Amino acid sequence: MAMALTIPRYTVADLERFPDDGQRYELLDGLLLVTPSPGVGHQLVATRLASALTGALESHPGIHVVGPGVVVREPRTQLQPDVMVFRAEGPLTASWKELRETWLAVEVLSPGSRVYDRDFKRDAYLALGVPEVWLVDLRERAVLISRTGAPPDQRVTGLLRWDSPHLDRPIELDLNRIFADLALGKGEVNGKTTGRHR
């Protein structure tokens, strides 16, 4: 007689007790996904995007750019976008749990997380109330934009114009500069998923 497979379900409190071992631990409705440390190309693009967003938004008080960020919805969901834009008035809290105005989540697609980011996290962010999600495709040197109430994965190359309803004016990002001098190694373009369930 076959035995039923039991998949462990975790809480945000459980996740806080996990080791700080260089891997990324995330929860989606209690399901745990572990992905390895990202490659150089992934980190370079994420850093450039965070820097470009910070520069473009510096005249907007109360808007912050971090990378990586954390989106928490207790008790069983905690996701870590590579770059996150959020609004917070006054002194910043030390707890991600208290942030509720996340305006943008950015995921840089990499072999260890490509399928998970594209097929699960994108929709999870939107369902959690994040109004816009960018998936950054290193292979195509493009950004796939998904917004609440709009068709997903609108492909943008060259110049990205972010016309968020939260901003008093659009901002523009030069994607050619973001992807400049990017020579991806085989491990960063083969699209294999290496994340594993604990």
Spans of features found by a protein language model:
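Gly/Pro/Ser/Thr-rich low-complexity, intrinsically disordered segments predominantly at protein N-termini
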Residues: 1-198
